[in-house]
C-alpha cells in the first residue's frame, strides 16, 4: 500500500485528486492537508511514499513546504502542482529537487503517469537500487 499526502488549499482540487488517485489504485492510502502548515504537520508526524503539493497556498507556500520535505524526508518524491503555470516557479521547484511539476487543471493521464513513476522510483530507492534523486546514480 502506498501512502500519499495531498497538500492543496482548494477543497475542490483536493477532492478531485483524492478521487482520481483512489480510482486509479484502491490500495493508495490518501491523506489530505488543507495548507502548507497542515502539510508540514502531517509530514512531521507520519511517513509518506509520495507527496502532491500545491505551490500557491496561504500561510506557507509550496516552495517552503518542498524545502521542508527535502530536509526532513529527502527520499520522498514530491510532485508540485500549480494553477499559476509560470516557468520560473516550475524551474525553481525542479531545481530544488521536486520529482515533477504539473500545471492546473492537471491532465489526469499525465498526473497518473507521474504518480506511478514517482512511486516506482521511491520503491527502487527503498530497495537500495537507486541512491537518491539528487545523485542520479543508478544501480539497475
Short names for language-model regions:
Residues 57:
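Receiver (REC) domain active-site loop signature in two-component systems and cognate sites
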Residues 8:
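Conserved acidic carboxylate
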Residues 41, 63-75, 92:
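Short amphipathic alpha-helix used as the core "switch/output" element in two-component signaling
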Residues 86, 106-116:
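C-terminal output helix
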Residues 32-50:
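Acidic, metal-coordinating helix/loop segments flanking the phosphotransfer/catalytic sites
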Residues 11-31:
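Two-component/phosphorelay signaling modules centered on CheY-like receiver
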Residues 35-38, 61-64, 82:
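Acidic catalytic/metal-coordinating carboxylates
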Amino acid at each position: 500500500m502506498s501512502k500519499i499526502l495531498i497538500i492543496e488549499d482548494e477543497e475542490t482540487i483536493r477532492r478531485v485528486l483524492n478521487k482520481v488517485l483512489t480510482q486509479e489504485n484502491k490500495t493508495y492510502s490518501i491523506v489530505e492537508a488543507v495548507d502548507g502548515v497542515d502539510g508540514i504537520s502531517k509530514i512531521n508526524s507520519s511517513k509518506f511514499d509520495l507527496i502532491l503539493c500545491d505551490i500557491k497556498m496561504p500561510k506557507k507556500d509550496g516552495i517552503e513546504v518542498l524545502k521542508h520535505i527535502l530536509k526532513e524526508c529527502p527520499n520522498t518524491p514530491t510532485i508540485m502542482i500549480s494553477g499559476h503555470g509560470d516557468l520560473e516557479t516550475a524551474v525553481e521547484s525542479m531545481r530544488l529537487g521536486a520529482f515533477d511539476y504539473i500545471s492546473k487543471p492537471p491532465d489526469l493521464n499525465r498526473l497518473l503517469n507521474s504518480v506511478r513513476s514517482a512511486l516506482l522510483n521511491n520503491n527502487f530507492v527503498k530497495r537500495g537500487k537507486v541512491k537518491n534523486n539528487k545523485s542520479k546514480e543508478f544501480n539497475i
